[in-house]
UniProtKB/Swiss-Prot annotation:
It comes from the Eukaryota. The modification N-acetylmethionine is found at residue 1. This is Pseudouridylate synthase 7 homolog. SUPFAM superfamilies: Pseudouridine synthase. It comes from Bos taurus. PROSITE patterns: TRUD, UPF0024. Its main location: nucleus. Residues 368-578 form the TRUD domain. The lineage of its organism: Eukaryota, Metazoa, Chordata, Craniata, Vertebrata.
């Protein structure tokens, strides 16, 4: 292996959280991560979510759609503070000053063990994610097909109400019905006058109320010579908790599957927004993996007993969202069922020659890249998430509390700064909590726990944080160890399998012996994430694992924790990933703001693909590649450009944002 000089890439603010390949552990991580005897509900990255806990709203672990059926139409008690997609420009303006300051104190790749490259080509620079539309992710489904939004039509279904259902009620009538549905006032019924009294008109109003406001019954009444449709609760609050199962045709699958196209919004925020518009709980939605915010992403979603017609109607209401490719099926989707993701990435204003680009992309196609856990795994603030995870594993609960709540270098939202300052001054969880307008962030949840259980019971207080988010801290520590050990392995033995390396046979890890080393390639070699149910290589790297954990006051021979949730069995992960379906082209352009390829929505609207001149002011590299779950597109791009992908490094390189 040849180490080459690292070059740089300029990044727009906020663009480092590049999509990692989501869902549960992939085939090569066949040794599944076990926590308390079962896999955690997973999200973005494989063993767990890769979007690590931060000072944002933290949704709890999603229930399955089956679990949500009993209360599937109950509006969430805690609605989102925002009811729509905020404009990208507004977000950037709001955060512009704080971001560069915050990133001065962030992590670099060196801090988390990312130090090696596999290729020998000369690196070059480029601008990554100058626009979120320069990064497009298409989910690869269970059947191996890449998800595309290609059809906005609604399946023909005799049971579906007419389009008039969505327009027959006035805004005032909808408001009154919603208040009735949610028991927001003392009214026991709402009467809608039928202006044009025909049977067809009355039928449409009945259908509209029952379709748009599940849990309400309707009847027709004559009042002083006028016809009214009266809406009411048939069985009190139980009707709302147990919606009209009898209204769903038995011949139709219980789940409406659809393709969700979204721009600049992460999956959980998208689900929460859809839930709000549909007036249902988020737990009736299911999906195979979550997608990050700063990108255009296309993925399959399933929802319990919501018609395609209702979903399609949202296309008229929501910006930067499109729903389509509807079908009714018997089963929901499950986390981890996807086969991976296909990425389309534009690197703008590249400096590399055509020959450099060719060498870099051929190396990516033929050799691949080191399967490091990307920077987003470790958080973006001055307190890395792996440090919290290490403290949990050490049973250092006072340190866990301190790391999450103490003041930290770099800019944060003002209310968080005030909350941390109050905590440092008073150590009063109730007083610090009062500084937070949004109490669903990790800090708010921990402070609530401390208020409830007291300062002497930090373990229980920490337990208020949703389980997945707690586990992400310790998974971050495992990832930190794995990155460092893989760098040592490649530094010590290069890019060839050696005796003592580990490979998987089915789900079982075995050692490569001297006489069968030629039967394997570097693409077969795996390395363990530390845990109580893994084996370690039989060469120098085994001792390196032991030394690293010993330095962190952890016993590699006893990775069981006194709290079951934090006893990690470990897992295996391939050290080199070779992307599939790799293609690329270099294009010339003059305007940094023009899109360089069509999206699914562009194609639906019949827009012609961009035409490029043979020469232009700038050059861009357009890359396409597919990755299995639990791999990071950032690390593939890093290998091509020979760059440090950390936000801290890119902020130092690019302090003036290109607009």
């Amino acid at each position: 292996m040849e180490m080459t000089e690292m070059t740089s890439v300029s990044l727009k603010r906020g663009s480092v959280a590049i999509e990692d390949n989501d869902s549960v552990a992939p085939a090569e991580e066949a040794k599944r991560q076990k926590v308390s005897g079962c896999c955690p509900t997973t999200g973005q990255d494989g063993i767990e979510n890769s979007s690590l806990p931060s000072s944002e709203k933290v949704p709890g672990p999603p229930e399955t759609a089956e679990q949500g059926e009993k209360n599937s139409e109950v509006p969430s008690e805690e609605e989102e503070e925002e009811d729509g997609l905020s404009e990208e420009e507004e977000e950037e303006e709001e955060e512009a000053e704080s971001f560069a300051d915050m990133m001065k104190h962030g992590l670099t790749e060196l801090d988390v063990g990312i130090t090696k490259f596999v290729s020998s080509h000369q690196g070059f620079s480029g601008i990554l994610k100058e626009r979120y539309s320069d990064f497009v992710v298409h989910e690869i489904g269970r059947d191996g097909r890449i998800s595309h939004l290609s059809d906005l039509s609604v399946p023909v279904d005799e049971e579906d109400p007419s389009e008039d259902v969505f327009t027959v009620l006035t805004a005032e009538e909808k408001q009154r019905l919603e208040e009735l549905q949610l028991f927001k006032n003392k009214e026991t019924s709402v009467a809608i006058e039928v202006i044009e009294d025909t049977k067809e008109k009355r039928t449409i109003i009945h259908q509209a109320i029952k379709s748009l406001f599940p849990g309400l019954e309707t009847k027709t009444e004559d009042r002083e010579g006028k016809k009214y449709i009266v809406a009411y609760h048939a069985a009190g609050k139980k009707a709302l908790a147990n919606p009209r199962k009898h209204s769903w045709p038995k011949s139709r699958g219980s789940y409406c599957h659809f393709v969700l196209y979204k721009e600049n919004k992460d999956t959980m925020d998208a689900i929460n927004l859809l839930s709000k518009y549909l007036r249902v709980k988020p737990n009736i939605f299911s999906y195979m993996g979550t997608k990050d915010k700063r990108a255009i992403t296309v993925q399959e979603i399933a929802v319990l007993k919501i018609t395609a017609q209702r979903l399609a109607h949202l296309n008229k209401c929501l910006m930067n969202f499109k729903l389509g490719n509807f079908s009714y099926q018997k089963n929901p989707l499950k986390l981890g069922e996807l086969q991976g993701n296909h990425f389309t990435v534009v690197l703008r204003n590249i400096t590399g020659t055509d020959n450099q680009v060719e060498q870099a992309m051929n190396s990516l196609k033929e050799i691949g890249f080191i399967n490091y856990y990307g920077m987003q795994r470790f958080g973006t603030t001055a307190v890395p998430t792996y440090q919290v995870g290490r403290a949990i594993l050490q049973n250092s609960w006072a340190e866990v509390m301190d790391l999450i709540l103490k003041p930290r270098s770099g800019a944060e939202k003002g209310y968080l700064v005030k909350c941390r300052e109050e905590w440092a001054k008073s150590k009063d969880p109730a007083a610090a909590l009062r500084k937070l307008p949004v109490k669903r962030c990790v800090e708010g949840q921990l402070l609530r726990g401390l208020s409830k259980y007291g300062m002497k019971n930090i373990v229980s207080a920490f337990g208020i944080i949703p389980r997945n988010n707690r586990l992400m801290y310790i998974h971050s520590y495992q990832s930190y160890v794995w990155n460092n050990m893989v760098s040592k392995r490649i530094d010590e033995y290069g890019l060839k399998p050696v005796p003592g390396d580990l490979v998987l046979k089915g789900a079982t890890a075995t050692f490569i012996e001297e006489d069968d080393v030629n039967n394997y390639s570097i693409h077969d070699v795996v390395m363990p994430l530390p845990g109580f149910d893994v084996i370690y290589p039989k060469h120098k790297i085994s001792e390196a694992y032991r030394e690293m954990l010993t330095a962190d006051n952890l016993d590699i021979d006893n990775m069981r924790h006194k709290i079951r949730d934090y006893s990690l069995s470990g897992a295996y992960r391939k050290i080199i990933i070779r992307p599939q379906n790799v293609s690329w082209e270099v294009v010339a352009y003059d305007d940094p703001k023009i899109p360089l390829f069509n999206t699914d929505v562009d194609n639906l609207e019949g827009r012609p693909p961009p035409v490029f001149a043979s020469e232009g002011k700038y050059r861009a590299l357009k890359m396409d590649f597919s990755l299995p779950p639990s791999t990071y597109a950032t690390m593939a791009i890093r290998e091509v450009l020979k760059m440090d992908t950390s936000i801290k490094n890119q902020t130092q390189l690019n302090t003036t944002w290109l607009r």
